[in-house]
A protein has these predicted regions:
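Short, charged/polar N-terminal "headpieces" of proteins
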Residues: 1-17
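A short, structured beta-strand/loop element
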Residues: 14-54
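C-terminal structural segments of small proteins and small subunits
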Residues: 48-76
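N-terminal start-of-chain detector that recognizes signal peptides
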Residues: 1-6, 27-31, 67
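A broadly conserved detector of short glycine/acidic/proline-rich loop/turn motifs that flank catalytic sites
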Residues: 10, 37, 63
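Residues in well-ordered beta-strands of folded domains
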Residues: 4-7, 21, 34, 58
Length: 76
């Protein structure tokens, strides 16, 4: 599997940005998100059990908006 850069949070510092990537999977469309690891106990309690092979991350709304805009424009 390969990852293709889609965009990052424009408000983040260089090298420290929440970022979104698309994969080249052929069986289904998937994305990879780089974000801040969630460690807040209340958030983790709200989410519930997370399998060891998964992680909860936080990304800014601007990254989701960027993805939605590019998806609608067909530029992904």
């Amino acid at each position: 599997m390969r990852a293709r850069f889609l965009g990052k949070d424009p408000e983040s510092n260089e090298g420290n940005s929440p970022t979104l990537f698309a994969t080249d999977r052929t069986d289904r469309a998937t994305y990879i998100a780089q974000g801040w690891k969630v460690t807040d106990p209340q958030v983790l309690a709200d989410v519930g059990d997370v399998p060891d092979h998964e992680a909860i991350i936080e990304i800014p709304e601007d990254v989701i908006k960027m993805w939605a805009r590019r998806y609608q424009e067909g530029t992904l």
